[in-house]
Amino acid sequence: MSSTKHRIDLGTTYSCVGVFKNEQVDIIANDQGNRTTPSYVAFTETERLIGDARRTRWHEPPGNTVFDEAHDRPQVRRPDLQSDMKHWPFKVIVKDGKPVISVEYQNQTKTFSRGDLGYGAAENEGDGGGYLGTTVKDAVITVPAYFNDSQRQATKDAGSIAGLNVLRIINEPTAAAIAYGMDRKGDKGEKNVLIFDLGGGTFDVTLLTIESGVFEVKATAGDTHLGG
């Protein structure tokens, strides 16, 4: 197995990719030179645009631009989904009992699940090979702490479809704690750590302990509509 691994953060508003190499993490710039990529996927008559590419095409129909996908809800009748749908420019419909997104793509009406769209973002963020000069396939993908099993599996599937070997799906606050602990390997005894993860659209708080390199989550809570 390669000793170099991706760490991909598919966020609500921005996504980024880091590479763990030589005991440290480097955040990789995208093809626009930015270290974070807008979490947008847009569809035109001829192509699919991801991230910064969508921002340069501001004149494209907003109904074909999908965002806010970290707010994945598997049940279409949930009040929070119904509320969000009033503000989204894109259309959400029911297919096989689950909400999917309907867009006009290549002159056809097509539907995509969150996993389908996550694949595009993962594929875009997974391109660390150009930075390293070698192919990197192993990846760890972080998700909000409140994600359930089906949401985590959808994220893992998206990475696999993008050609990545997804080693683990871990909570974003846990990833932050691991990064904190990496710089304090010499610390003795048990430490209590409180992680505040305020993102562009979600908020998580996690309480955990660190002792001898072992991380144990004691409690976690969050708000899926608090961020900015």
Swiss-Prot record:
Keyword set, alphabetical order: ATP-binding, Nucleotide-binding, Stress response
Intrachain S-S bonds: none
Biased composition (Basic and acidic residues): 68-80
SUPFAM superfamilies, sorted: Actin-like ATPase domain (SSF53067)
Alphabetized Gene3D superfamilies for the sequence: 3.30.30.30, 3.30.420.40
Entries under Pfam families matching the protein: HSP70 (PF00012)
Coiled-coil residues: none
Span list, region Disordered: 57-80
Gene Ontology MF terms: ATP binding; ATP-dependent protein folding chaperone
ATP-binding among keywords: yes
Family per similarity comment: Belongs to the heat shock protein 70 family.
Protein name per UniProt: Heat shock 70-related protein 4
UniProt source species: Leishmania major
